[in-house]
Structure formats: C-alpha cells, structure tokens
C-alpha cells in the first residue's frame, strides 16, 4: 500500500519536528516547508538520525504568495496538510501586532488557496483563542472571548477562515487542534525546543537559565488569584502532542464522510502553576533555581487547563507522558545541545 504523503509547514520547528518524526514512525511520507526564521536546518539532519529517513524539504516563506503558487503547481499530490508555520510569542505579538496578523494569517491563506481541495487539513491552533475563560476546565464549547493577545486573535481568525473554507469545499476536511502549553523533548535527546532568539516559553527559559545561557530568570506576577499567586497552565508533553496529530489524521482518513470540520482541545486536563513548574524542575535536576518576581505581563491569562474528554472519545487520544518525565526530557535536551 502506498504511503500517504503529508505536508508539514513549519516542520523544523519545535512541534513540527516532533510531529514529523511521529508521522515517519507511523509510515507516512513527509514533505516539510520551513523558512528557518525560528528553526535550524540542523533539525532536518537530526530527524534523519532518529528515523533513518530524510523527509522532503523546501525552504521558503509561505507568506510569499508567488512562491507558494509556484511550489504548489509542482507539488500538489498531498493527502494531508498539517499547518504549524506561524509566529508564536504572546509577549512579542503585543509589541508587534501587525507582524503577527500578516505572518500568521497570510501564511494560512496561501495554503487552501493553492492545495487540492480533496485533502485532510490539520490546523495548529491554541488555547489562547479562549481568552480568560470564566469556567474551568475549558471545553471546546467554552465561549471564545476576545483573546488577550494579537497572537491568540490570529489563531481565532485562522480558525474562522478554515471553517468558512471547509463549508464551501465539499471534499475538504479540517481538524482544529487547540494546544495548551507544549513542554519536553524527544526521548533521544536529539531534538527539543530550541528557539533562535531569547526563549518566550517557561520551560526553555528555566533550562537555559539553569545551564547558564540566560543570566536572569523572572516570574511575571505572583499576585494572581491562584493557589500560589502565579499563572496556571496545562502543560502537554511534546510526544503526546505529536501523537494527537496522528490521531487527528487517522480520524479524518478513516471517516467515510467528507467535508468534516471539528475542533479538539489537546492538553492533559490538569493545571500547573509557574512555581510548581519551577519546583518540578528543581526536583528532577537537583538544582535550586532563584528567580526575580516582576509585575504581571500584558496578554497573560490567569489560568487555563483543558477538558480533553472529546479527544479521548472521538480521537481515542489521551496524554500518557508524566509531567515530571516531560520536564526531565527538556533538561536532558538542554544538556545535550
């Protein structure tokens, strides 16, 4: 049987690279598009080192409509598309909103505008579309408030675009995966979260501070109405998140019905505070990190964690890696880089 061919945009990034490995392990053929703005070509070599297979790779920016059109004229035989390519910092999006609106929305528009309509489409969305939810845990039917950041708003707009596009394309099927907070690294220690610039996410900030790459480490706000005063998030191990994409693809490929549009939360169902993450890192690493406390950061919600019962029921997916193991894998990756 011929392997299904999956296009992974942003496939050398953090989530994209782990998902690429999961796809290859499941027997899919993979093609990656990445502009290397927040990733490295070295990841491609490491994917081959882990899987013994080198996926097809094309370097260009999906916001370039002309290049996208040229690419898809020559390469339009994909069975599925997983779209990761996007800017992803909440804090940076508050400072550079137009960069985020242009990059994240334009790169999406240039995909369904060019690909075959008979395709299974997985979109990398975010729990930021919920804003500050009034009730926890967050379900897929939780009302979407105005997101707290331009980043979150771009994800919300992209969801709307895909929903509208799916309505008019009778053969297009779409799954939206609303991630909570990915953490951890591949068990090989060969790939993990490795931002080109100063990290924006909590765990790589912690690991880079612990190893000496960062000289300062700050917690933004310890006066939130939470159990210890710091923000609470649902931290999803990266290997579980990668598997969620496989489950979503298999759900679409096995479904006899065309023109599906469905949304799933991808988290663990449990929230951890910033202080609890630091404590867990200290426990698995043997460190005793000291940090500064600074004022609250604009764009941060107080608390967010998922209800994942829908993904369990329909996708037959659930998180399996423990929080401590995910934190330890991130630390092992930091030391192996």
List each language-model region with its residue ranges.
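N-terminal Rossmann/SDR dinucleotide-binding element
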Residues: 2-80, 198
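Conserved Rossmann-fold NAD(P)-dependent oxidoreductase catalytic core, especially the SDR/UDP-sugar
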Residues: 83, 109-150, 168, 175
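Short alpha-helical oligomerization interface
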Residues: 90-106, 139-147
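NAD(P)-cofactor binding segment of oxidoreductase domains
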Residues: 95-122, 160
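Short-chain dehydrogenase/reductase
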Residues: 101, 148-156, 192-200, 204, ...
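Flexible, glycine-rich beta-alpha linker
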Residues: 130-131, 149-150, 172-199, 226-227
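Active-site Tyr-X1-5-Lys
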Residues: 148-183, 204-212
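C-terminal substrate-binding subdomain of Rossmann-fold SDR/epimerase-dehydratase oxidoreductases
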Residues: 205, 211-337
């Amino acid at each position: 049987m011929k392997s299904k061919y999956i296009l992974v945009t942003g496939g050398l990034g953090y989530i994209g690279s782990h998902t690429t490995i999961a796809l290859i392990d499941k027997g899919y053929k993979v093609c990656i598009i990445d502009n290397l703005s927040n990733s490295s070509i070295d990841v491609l070599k490491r994917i081959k080192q882990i899987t013994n297979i080198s996926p097809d790779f094309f370097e260009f920016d999906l916001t370039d409509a002309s290049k996208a059109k040229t690419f898809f004229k020559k390469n339009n035989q994909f069975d599925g598309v997983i779209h990761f390519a996007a800017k992803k910092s909440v804090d940076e999006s508050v400072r550079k909103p137009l960069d985020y609106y242009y990059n994240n929305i334009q790169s999406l528009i240039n995909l369904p505008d060019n690909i075959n309509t008979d395709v299974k489409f997985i979109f990398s969305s975010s729990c930021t579309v919920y804003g500050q939810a009034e009730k926890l845990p967050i379900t897929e039917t939780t009302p979407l408030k105005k997101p707290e950041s331009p980043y979150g708003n771009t994800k919300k707009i992209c969801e709307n675009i895909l929903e509208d596009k799916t309505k008019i394309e009778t053969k297009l099927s779409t799954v939206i995966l609303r991630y909570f907070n990915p953490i951890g690294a591949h068990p090989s220690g060969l790939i993990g979260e490795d931002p080109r610039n100063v990290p924006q996410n909590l765990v790589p900030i912690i690991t880079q501070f612990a190893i000496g790459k960062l000289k300062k480490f700050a917690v933004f706000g310890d006066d939130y109405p939470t159990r210890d005063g710091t923000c609470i998030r649902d931290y999803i191990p990266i290997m579980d998140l990668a598997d969620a994409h496989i489950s979503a693809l298999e759900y679409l490929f096995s479904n006899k019905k065309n023109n599906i549009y469905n949304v799933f939360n991808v988290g663990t169902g449990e929230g951890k505070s910033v202080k609890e993450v630091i404590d867990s890192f200290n426990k698995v690493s043997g460190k005793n990190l000291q940090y500064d406390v600074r004022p609250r950061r604009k764009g941060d919600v107080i608390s967010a964690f998922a209800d994942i019962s829908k993904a369990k029921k329909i996708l037959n997916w659930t998180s399996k890696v423990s929080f401590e193991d995910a934190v330890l894998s991130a630390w092992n990756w930091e030391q192996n880089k």
